[in-house]
């Protein structure tokens, strides 16, 4: 993770809204199903944290909420996932209008890591090359997950 460079600054208020998962990559040690979900909405809390409302596909679509707590670094947030541990959610790249890329890694075990590419519109492909560049910097083996949008819950 040390060799991955994130954005220097972030306008968190520009993330508000819906995002669709386009593709993801995760290490073998990463077991959280976060990357099987679209983001129904991103909300900014009064404290400057981000609240994600996710749509999880099980036998039906279920809403889940995650709170991303701001840190001293403007592009990083801390997230606690029950039955797991604390993770750092790091925004790697975005143009705010069409795509954003982030990586999520375990604070105590950096081998547990995943990165994802989200888009504003289902048919959007912007950010694909930037996502591939990030994947080339990963030091550990990973699996790429291609998302079939028909299998996802839609906003």
UniProtKB/Swiss-Prot annotation:
Gene3D superfamilies: 2.40.128.20. Disulfide bonds join 61-153, 103-115. GO terms for cellular component: extracellular region. It is found in: Secreted. InterPro entries: Calycin (IPR012674), Lipocalin (IPR002345), Lipocln_cytosolic_FA-bd_dom (IPR000566). It comes from the Eukaryota. PANTHER family: GLYCODELIN, LIPOCALIN. Lactoglobulin is the primary component of whey, it binds retinol and is probably involved in the transport of that molecule. This is Beta-lactoglobulin. It comes from Macropus giganteus (Eastern gray kangaroo). The gene is LGB.
